[in-house]
């Protein structure tokens, strides 16, 4: 998870806010007419890693601290998140978030990584939420390098949202 977080950090990011619970199985990563082998080839991972990712993300889990990030981070407690986002108006909720975390660009949510049977390749789902009309979700492929460190090898955009064009 740390490798994916560090890979996506831009120079202007002062703090990362990470949702304190994993995403769970929030997105169908495979189109209905695609085999898992074809999906694995497209993503640059293994079918086993995809199966493992789906298996371990059936439920949400609490994240623990200890990420090795190059930027300071805050693990957002679920109760605090619920308090910040309790209003019916999404704009008000994001105003609450920005007041609580003025040095953060948004909230990162991550799945548990699915690791292949050789423990050399991993698949991770990562979302970035930056407003009520701002966010994206990606599948991140990681591999162990020669020094046994996880490195991002590729990413695939799953979804993206942005404000509508006023035209």
Predicted regions and their residues:
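Flexible low-complexity loop/turn motifs enriched in small/helix-breaking residues
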Residues: 1-123, 127-136, 156-167
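Short beta-strand edge/turn micro-motifs at domain boundaries
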Residues: 140-163
């Amino acid at each position: 998870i740390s490798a994916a977080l560090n890979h996506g950090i831009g120079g202007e990011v002062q703090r990362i806010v990470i949702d304190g619970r994993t995403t769970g199985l929030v997105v169908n990563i495979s189109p209905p007419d695609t085999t898992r082998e074809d999906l694995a080839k497209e993503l640059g991972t293994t079918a086993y890693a995809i199966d493992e990712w789906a298996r371990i993300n059936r439920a949400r889990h609490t994240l623990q601290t200890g990420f090795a990030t190059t930027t300071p981070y805050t693990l957002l407690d679920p109760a605090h998140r619920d308090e910040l986002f309790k209003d019916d108006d999404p704009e008000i909720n994001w105003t609450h978030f920005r007041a609580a975390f003025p040095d953060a660009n948004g909230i990162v949510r991550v799945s548990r990584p699915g690791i292949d049977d050789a423990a050399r390749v991993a698949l991770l789902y990562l979302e970035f939420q930056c407003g009520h009309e701002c966010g994206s979700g990606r599948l991140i492929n990681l591999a162990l390098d020669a020094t046994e460190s996880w490195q991002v090898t590729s990413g695939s955009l799953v979804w993206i949202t942005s404000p509508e064009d006023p035209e």
